[in-house]
């Protein structure tokens, strides 16, 4: 008879240790009294979880910058040189390793020079998103006043503890301007005219910006390049960039979700010029939005979207199913990249991810792409972060879209009002993973049956990831089941649990969300783990995200 451990090894998915059962009958029913089981294999390290996986994305879109981050130096709203103080306070709790700016699509229409120099002399420009913004949107959403530029963004990063990640304009600015932007940010004090300009703005010391995106979604109207054409553009932009003795990490514009032809075309074109060309790329950007909830009925961008607040159990599972595709995308693009970049020098950078719903749930009128995140989005975000945690050898960075007042926001703000969304709470709960050693964990649970347009189907029963800091195990668990608890036995092998804490985010209403009027509808609850001489058993509530921090003997 096959040993139980060997059965688990063979049944688990190689990439993440996620066990999917094709039958509603539990294959482990006779092995444990609990309905579900998690086996943490502490000896099987997957790699170090880069804190950059917990990155963020800010763009001059809707109320992200103006009204979200930037309130102005003369505002009555508490601020630090114009930056919303309450936002900074909460961001420090999530340890934002890296923050991306100014886009996104906005980046390929942005001239960095417009956002430096005396604030009163900066030009006003038509925002790239002008045609998307609502007619009742504030003028700052449609016409960029450039009050928040490079200096202010770097100051924001320093206040919150994140590293800046700047995206260069490849569509409408020459490579020379990319070099000049790097010079403005990184040249030593007093060394160049641009260093003097930076000093005049209040920063004599260099910003030391390491991460630079070379364009954004260059396959689309932000370049309309073929992959071979973009490879030539990337080579030109990367041919010479001033480094000032410190390495720069250049991030290339990657595919539109599952477009493997873009990935192959880009890497083959680079390789034709020699291996050193591939080695000039630090990361390959991959974007994935879970937007199509039409269940195969349409691929239309507008008609396929679901509602952020009005959804049923089927819509719940369909969003998670769409989100889980990112793991397949990581695997397929990674495999293809390895055919050309055989040493896997280039890593994946998932610098845009999250759900994208149709308009209508915004709490601030005029914020066209603002969404109200619910418990569904919290579970989605936990699931996605767990996928990144389980792939630390492949994913070097990830950036949730977006930080505030747009799409999968961690925070919502308007004027003097501010609230942490369920997504923001998830990011704080996952902090213990940052910098930890990811270890393989096998999650076992009966699949969840549900009816999908008259046809029976299933969804997995538990999901999560595990990491270790010294003797401390961080284990995050998502229970996607909208109805049932999951009583789960947790095994850590020979290293027995001594003590621990458990933090759970859940709500009986899967539509629950936090608002300016009711800020604490969805909040995490923390308590001490009850650990005895018998097996550790934890009951995970329906539709929940849980973090366990366990001290091991």
List where the protein language model places each region:
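Long, well-ordered, tryptophan-enriched scaffold segments
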Residues: 258, 280-311, 317
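Beta-strand-rich domain onsets/edges
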Residues: 321-322
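Non-catalytic accessory regions flanking glycosidase/transglycosidase catalytic cores in CAZymes
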Residues: 3, 7-21, 27-283, 326-359, ...
């Amino acid at each position: 008879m096959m040993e139980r451990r060997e059965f688990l090894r063979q049944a688990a998915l190689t990439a993440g240790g996620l066990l999917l059962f094709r039958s509603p009958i539990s294959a482990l029913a006779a092995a444990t009294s609990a309905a579900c089981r998690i086996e943490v294999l502490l000896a099987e390290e997957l790699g170090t979880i880069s804190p950059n996986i917990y990155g963020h994305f800010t763009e001059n879109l809707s109320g992200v910058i103006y009204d979200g981050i930037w309130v102005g130096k003369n505002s009555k709203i508490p601020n630090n040189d114009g930056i919303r103080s309450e936002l900074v306070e909460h961001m420090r709790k999530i340890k934002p390793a890296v923050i991306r700016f100014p886009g996104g699509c906005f980046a390929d229409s942005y001239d960095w020079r417009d956002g430096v120099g005396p604030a009163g002399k900066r030009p006003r420009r038509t925002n790239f998103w002008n045609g998307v913004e609502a007619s009742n949107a504030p003028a700052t959403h449609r016409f960029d006043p450039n009050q928040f530029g490079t200096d202010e963004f770097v100051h924001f990063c320093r206040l919150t503890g994140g590293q800046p990640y700047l995206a260069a304009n490849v569509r409408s600015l020459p490579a020379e301007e990319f070099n000049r932007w790097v010079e403005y940010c990184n040249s030593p004090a007093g060394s160049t005219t641009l260093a003097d300009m930076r000093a005049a703005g209040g920063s004599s010391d260099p910003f030391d910006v390491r991460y630079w995106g070379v364009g954004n979604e260059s396959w689309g109207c932000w370049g309309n390049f073929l992959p071979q054409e973009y490879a030539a553009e990337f080579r030109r932009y990367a041919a010479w960039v001033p480094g000032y003795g410190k390495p720069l990490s250049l991030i290339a514009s990657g595919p539109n979700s599952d477009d493997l032809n873009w990935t192959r075309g880009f890497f083959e074109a680079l390789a034709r010029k020699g291996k050193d060309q591939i080695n000039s790329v630090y990361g390959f950007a991959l974007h994935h939005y879970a937007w199509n909830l039409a269940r195969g009925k349409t691929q239309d961008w507008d008609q396929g979207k679901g509602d952020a607040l009005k959804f049923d159990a089927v819509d719940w599972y369909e969003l998670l199913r769409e989100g889980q595709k990112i793991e397949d995308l990581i695997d397929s693009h990674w495999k293809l990249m390895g055919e050309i970049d055989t040493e896997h020098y280039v890593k994946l950078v998932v610098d845009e991810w999250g759900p994208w719903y149709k308009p209508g749930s915004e709490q601030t009128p005029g914020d066209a792409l603002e969404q109200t995140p619910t418990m569904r989005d919290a579970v989605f975000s936990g699931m996605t972060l767990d996928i990144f945690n389980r792939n630390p050898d492949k994913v070097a960075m990830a950036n949730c879209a977006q930080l505030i007042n747009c799409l999968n926001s961690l925070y919502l703000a308007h004027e003097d009002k501010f609230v942490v969304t369920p997504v923001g709470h998830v990011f704080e709960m996952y902090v213990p993973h940052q910098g930890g050693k990811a270890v393989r964990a096998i999650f076992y649970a009966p699949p969840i049956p549900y009816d999908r347009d008259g046809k029976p189907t299933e969804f997995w029963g538990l999901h999560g990831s595990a990491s270790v800091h010294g003797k401390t195990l961080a284990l995050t668990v998502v229970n996607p089941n909208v109805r049932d608890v999951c009583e789960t036995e947790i095994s850590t092998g020979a290293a027995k649990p001594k003590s621990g804490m458990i933090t759970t985010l859940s709500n009986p209403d899967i539509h629950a969300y936090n608002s300016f009027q009711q800020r604490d509808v969805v909040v995490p609850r923390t308590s001490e783990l009850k650990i005895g001489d018998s097996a550790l058993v934890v009951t995970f509530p329906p539709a929940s995200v849980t973090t366990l921090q366990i001290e091991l003997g």
